[in-house]
């Protein structure tokens, strides 16, 4: 069953009550976004503003979209990943008046069809996750460019794409790299990805992590979190990295560091978090142990190269939900989780609510910042002002009952002076 109207396209609109329960549940653990929602409800900063979003459509993102709607915005949304949509949550959004077009398991053609439908509101602001919507506007929906004030981007992968657009001088409007805010990458990328990736792997496999060799490919903030939590679960952690500085940092953090070919021979579980293509490919599959498990924590399903796996396999099956078994000619079996897509969102519920509270507070404030400042911003990639980062941190600390120290006037003067020495 699929329910489609001009205002939404969802799997089953009757699932809305269950979706609303999920949204209500996570909202209780998102005090910063609650604070911003109350502010938006009072001030209506988005009255008359149209906002289109491409996000993982699950309960936390739903609360963000409803917060923007509470601020007076007309909101539309489509999925940023074909397999991360939660159909009951999407139904709830439709019932709440968000123009939403997403079905879990949608085809690639439907993915872009739904994104185009979300763009049909002719947005002033875009909220993106992976830069697909911004890219689509610049390639196939150029008629919308003059009405777009700016966009915000949630992910490392998306920011990389957008900086490439800026470098090539094709970016037509300002973009806020929310991913590059301290309150995003220090918490979401590290603690959020670290916990939710292992949540997805363990739900998909029901296997023990302790005692296994875990290979983490990429040691950015996401890789750091994945490695940290793997160690906490009792694994021996091996990091694969191309950046010599990050590789050295991983070694100083206590992890083994190897090339991919070396790690492929001994790994039990492989997790990619690079934002790049073909990080695990044929030459590595050929070296892996029987029973090796692979999962991806990067945005797109290109880090573990499935075409090579399919060519090597003599038989492909699904022994469990979200687990694909590739049987090779020599009898070895390799397992790919979540079809190589984001394991934390496909096989689990994504990041914890308390983490996304901070990230989505930044997204809400980024939309407000674009609305208030777009006339003076140039078509390039920006980072949110530090005061917004600090505001989110202070509200979060208050919600946790934590008081921090304040500088005295004497200390402030000392820090601003150059005259005090030895």
From Swiss-Prot:
One of its GO terms (cellular component) is cytosol. It holds the Pfam family AdoHcyase_NAD. It is an enzyme of class 3 (hydrolase). NAD(+) binds at residues 155-157, 189, 218-223, 241, 276, 297-299, 344. It is found in: Cytoplasm. It catalyses: S-adenosyl-L-homocysteine + H2O = L-homocysteine + adenosine. It comes from the Archaea. Substrate binds at residues 129, 154, 184, 188. Binds 1 NAD(+) per subunit. GO terms for biological process: L-homocysteine biosynthetic process; one-carbon metabolic process; S-adenosylmethionine cycle. Pathway: Amino-acid biosynthesis; L-homocysteine biosynthesis; L-homocysteine from S-adenosyl-L-homocysteine: step 1/1. InterPro entries: Adenosylhomocyst_ase-like_sf, Adenosylhomocysteinase-like, Ado_hCys_hydrolase_NAD-bd, NAD(P)-bd_dom_sf, S-Ado-L-homoCys_hydrolase_CS. Keywords: Cytoplasm, Hydrolase, NAD, One-carbon metabolism. Its cofactor is NAD(+). Signal peptide: none annotated. Its EC number is 3.13.2.1. Belongs to the adenosylhomocysteinase family. May play a key role in the regulation of the intracellular concentration of adenosylhomocysteine. This is Adenosylhomocysteinase. The gene is ahcY.
